[in-house]
Amino acid sequence: MEEKEFKSGFVALVGRPNVGKSTLMNYLVGQKVAITSNKPQTTRNRISGIYTSDRMQVIFVDTPGIFKPHSKLDDYMDKASLSSLNDVDLVLFMVEPEDMGKGDQYIADLLKEVKVPVFLVINKVDQIHPNKLLPIMDSYHKLDGFKEILPISATQGIGIDDLLNTIYKYLPAGPQYYDADQITDRPEYFVVAELIREQILRLTSQEVPHATAVVVDQMNKHQNGKLVIEATIYVERDGQKGIIIGKGGKMLKQIGIDSRKEIERLLGEKVNLRLWVKVQHNWRSDPSFLKQIGYDKKELG
């Protein structure tokens, strides 16, 4: 039997907010490396998930959802999405199983300038009857620019084998860039900060989640064997600080409990998590503060 050629490459996940890019990446790598929520703009930074098998290694670049910017942070997120298309081997343009709206069309127009193959990936097909999916797929087939059109469900695993087989077909032969057990290119403290932010997204509402940034100040082993993590939650106004802390500190305690469970699951060890809340007025439009907490445009090349 002929041995399969080993292939490797970088694949960008692109689409509107909340189409399931992070969910797909987490499914493919088998562990949570990108946070998810039902709120727009959950992903802020580029983060890569690494899928390795005996025939290929794929570095999936999960980008912030593309939308029209309203603040410096929004502008950073949009540039983070678009910059990831400059140096990848494939682009997966993710949409929901519905007719193409203005947001999708905006992205489709941007992708016409991309020089690498673009796959249209229709996610959440488990949420629609097959009879309704077929005409939607037909309408997408009439559009130019897509090398492949693939229906999947990132939560149920539907169509994932076909997706991986198709990616393999298009990838170039190449080396294994990362160890087989490495699942992300981001350091642990980055993923830990994101897991805390995920719980804030889940537990708070209105403007509070989007006015929040999390910075891990230190991660140190304690004498009792527990890992001690100290992190600061930044908000823009005193009122938001009060909401994060909650009556009698209840909300902050709940954020801490739920975050600790996710962090322990990720790291596989007991964690002592200590959280502080600070006000940094209008941080989303403050370039120097954005740089200080890791939203550095130098990263965008």
From Swiss-Prot:
One of its GO terms (molecular function) is GTP binding. Residues 62-65 are annotated as: G3. Residues 123-126 are annotated as: G4. Residues 196-281 form the KH type-2 domain. GO terms for cellular component: cytosol; plasma membrane. GTP binds at residues 15-22, 62-66, 123-126. CDD domains: Era, KH-II_Era. Its main location: cytoplasm. Residues 7-173 form the Era-type G domain. It is a peripheral membrane protein. GO terms for biological process: ribosomal small subunit assembly. InterPro entries: G_ERA_dom, GTP-bd, GTPase_Era-like, KH_dom-like_a/b, KH_dom_type_2, KH_sf_prok-type, P-loop_NTPase, Small_GTP-bd. Residues 152-154 are annotated as: G5. Keywords: Cell membrane, Cytoplasm, GTP-binding, Membrane, Nucleotide-binding, Ribosome biogenesis, RNA-binding, rRNA-binding. Monomer. Belongs to the TRAFAC class TrmE-Era-EngA-EngB-Septin-like GTPase superfamily. Era GTPase family. NCBIfam families: era, PRK00089.1, small_GTP. An essential GTPase that binds both GDP and GTP, with rapid nucleotide exchange. Plays a role in 16S rRNA processing and 30S ribosomal subunit biogenesis and possibly also in cell cycle regulation and energy metabolism. PANTHER family: GTPASE ERA, GTPASE ERA, MITOCHONDRIAL. This is GTPase Era. It comes from Lactobacillus acidophilus (strain ATCC 700396 / NCK56 / N2 / NCFM). The gene is era.
